[in-house]
Amino acid sequence: WESLTLLMSNFVEPLLQQGFRVVAFDAPGHGHSDTQATDVVDFSRALAHVIRHVGEAYGIVAHSCGGAATTLMLENNPDITPTNVVLVAPMPSLQKHVEVFQELAALPGHVFARFIEGLERRLGMSILEVDAASAAQHVKAKGLIIHDLDDSLIPHSAGYWIAKNWQDSSFVTTTGLGHLNI
């Protein structure tokens, strides 16, 4: 994975100035974490662990795969109840994500099928069950979903569908920022 906590640093200072405590971590397989590989389910478990370790979270800000991990974590951990959640360019589902990976890596169909089989074995579930838009239906926090029209990695419509399924959320569209500069 390309991302690390440092890329989210622009959010930190304004939150600190408003009196919030900010906790940031490199998810498994990201940045300076000890693991080399991860998946969105592992990411969601790590997020729940961090929140339980540091205490109640007033809000969560997550980008890309972290957005999917956050919605899955909130769906599967009803005892974790942040007031606000911001998802920036969120990944919609594991299925869509691996389809993008297949396209970028130009994997032949039979190789991709074996990749999916291995991934599902690792997860212990079908990739169809890992769906942020569906999980968003169960999130009680107030949500803000932000997605750029020019995101070349995750389509703008992904953020739209997550927001549409999230009862108490707003959707904001940006233009010209892509996936990483948003």
Pin down the residues of each PLM region.
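Active-site nucleophile elbow and catalytic-triad environment of alpha/beta-hydrolase enzymes
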Residues: 118-136, 141
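Hydrolase active-site cap/lid region
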Residues: 75-125
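Short beta-strand/loop motif that positions the catalytic acidic residue
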Residues: 138-140, 145-147, 151
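Short alpha-helix in the alpha/beta-hydrolase fold that links the catalytic acid
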Residues: 132, 141, 155-164
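Catalytic histidine-centered segment of alpha/beta-hydrolase-like enzymes
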Residues: 177-182
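Alpha/beta-hydrolase active-site loop
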Residues: 35-58
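Conserved alpha/beta-hydrolase
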Residues: 5, 12-34
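Gly/Ala-rich beta-loop-alpha elbow adjacent to hydrolase catalytic centers
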Residues: 61-70
